[in-house]
Amino acid sequence: MVMSSPTNSARIILISGIASGQGKTTVTAALARKLIRQGLRVRVFKTGPDYLDPMILQRASGAEVYALDLWMVGLDDCRRLLARAASEVDVILIEGVMGLYDGDPSSADLARAFGVPVVVVLDAAKMAQTVGAVVLGLQQYGPVDLAGVIVNRLASPSHASMVTRGIRNVPILATLPKQQQALPERHLGLVQPDEIAQVDQVLDQLADQIEIDMVAWDAIAPVVLDGSLAAASTQQLLAGKTIAIARDAAFAFVYHANLECLRAAGAQLKFFSPLNDETIPAEADAVYIPGGYPELHCATLSSAQRWQDSMRAAHVRNMPILAECGGMMVIADSLIDAQGKKWPMVGLIPGEVAMQGKLAGLGMQSLATEDGELRGHAFHYSTLSTPVEPQAQTVKRSNGAHGEAVYKQGALTATYFHAYFSSCPAATARIFSPEIKA
């Protein structure tokens, strides 16, 4: 099965579905681990801005998982990321988002942009021959290159036989039986891999269970990707700067591309753990507290006095701080958890964060800056009540309405907006080094 391919060429498939909840992440993880067992070099990407699915996929594949989105990441950077991966591996799996044609841009748009064939995951738990009608509809709604179907949650051999009879003119690339142990979820999506008991055993079981039709697999032609493997030249606007980044189970929502962007701008990165009550590293010139699940760790964070004191001291010294989503939640005066208990927090911004019983912010957004448009997204279940007036607001891509508030307190920037740094490296650099001249 090992492929001898030209440079920037690999067997690439985009794994999509008719909706969320069909098992795309489960199937992609199972397929990645299975192919790696067979001696193939595999890289996985995730369509859209999600943080959690990539963590599972990274655990399954053993390699960093990057986001692909034609708007947030951009066409050129998507091409560069794919071409770089294709020069290094045999197989690229791209997990889509929502349904195949959902969103603007959709997973189908991404597949068409790079000539990538699509494989659709269908949850057959409550269907049989009707699966064929669904496949036919996806074909006709296109156009996409529909290279195959992966049928998930088959109950028995007879169920598989009925499903197979219903699908015409499209190969069944793989099948996966109903799983006894599914990947668990919570309010922001799948849980983080380290929270799943015996996660590697679960992933190995999925790899054992997925059955691949190697004839159908080998019929998928490699995709050749043109374009430079190098990122666009970035000014060394952060040369000589050290950025301290919170990284632990409470603050894990960081794009690998964001770290690359900071390094490309010349920054040195140092990581520390608020959950372990670690102080900001002494050599830090700026601090980044990213998003995550601080609401699940209120007691620990509220009692982490050494970390809290170091944050307050940095703020008093006017050290640049970016507190992003979950990061902003912990730098308010207090955080009210899902059970209604109030926990004292760092107090760099006056006000209170409270968990809500429903989604409080969602969608792709952009922030206009003096350096250009910084793109990203929001996805949160809490709200901030504060007397501080926002310095700016993001704009929702879907309708042009106001999105998330951006607060400034000295050199502190706080917002629910998750920025994709490479969409505007100069604006990103200015957050961490406000003295940069325009």
Curated annotation (Swiss-Prot):
<feature type="site" description="Increases nucleophilicity of active site Cys">
    <location>
        <position position="418"/>
    </location>
</feature>
<comment type="pathway">
    <text>Cofactor biosynthesis; adenosylcobalamin biosynthesis; cob(II)yrinate a,c-diamide from sirohydrochlorin (anaerobic route): step 10/10.</text>
</comment>
<dbReference type="InterPro" id="IPR004484">
    <property type="entry name" value="CbiA/CobB_synth"/>
</dbReference>
<keyword id="KW-0460">Magnesium</keyword>
<keyword id="KW-0169">Cobalamin biosynthesis</keyword>
<dbReference type="GO" id="GO:0042242">
    <property type="term" value="F:cobyrinic acid a,c-diamide synthase activity"/>
</dbReference>
<keyword id="KW-0436">Ligase</keyword>
<keyword id="KW-0067">ATP-binding</keyword>
<comment type="function">
    <text>Catalyzes the ATP-dependent amidation of the two carboxylate groups at positions a and c of cobyrinate, using either L-glutamine or ammonia as the nitrogen source.</text>
</comment>
<feature type="domain" description="GATase cobBQ-type">
    <location>
        <begin position="242"/>
        <end position="426"/>
    </location>
</feature>
<protein>
    <recommendedName>
        <fullName>Cobyrinate a,c-diamide synthase</fullName>
        <ecNumber>6.3.5.11</ecNumber>
    </recommendedName>
</protein>
<keyword id="KW-0547">Nucleotide-binding</keyword>
<feature type="active site" description="Nucleophile">
    <location>
        <position position="325"/>
    </location>
</feature>
<dbReference type="InterPro" id="IPR029062">
    <property type="entry name" value="Class_I_gatase-like"/>
</dbReference>
<dbReference type="Pfam" id="PF01656">
    <property type="entry name" value="CbiA"/>
</dbReference>
<dbReference type="InterPro" id="IPR027417">
    <property type="entry name" value="P-loop_NTPase"/>
</dbReference>
<dbReference type="InterPro" id="IPR011698">
    <property type="entry name" value="GATase_3"/>
</dbReference>
<comment type="similarity">
    <text>Belongs to the CobB/CbiA family.</text>
</comment>
<keyword id="KW-0315">Glutamine amidotransferase</keyword>
<dbReference type="GO" id="GO:0009236">
    <property type="term" value="P:cobalamin biosynthetic process"/>
</dbReference>
<dbReference type="InterPro" id="IPR002586">
    <property type="entry name" value="CobQ/CobB/MinD/ParA_Nub-bd_dom"/>
</dbReference>
<dbReference type="GO" id="GO:0005524">
    <property type="term" value="F:ATP binding"/>
</dbReference>
<dbReference type="Pfam" id="PF07685">
    <property type="entry name" value="GATase_3"/>
</dbReference>
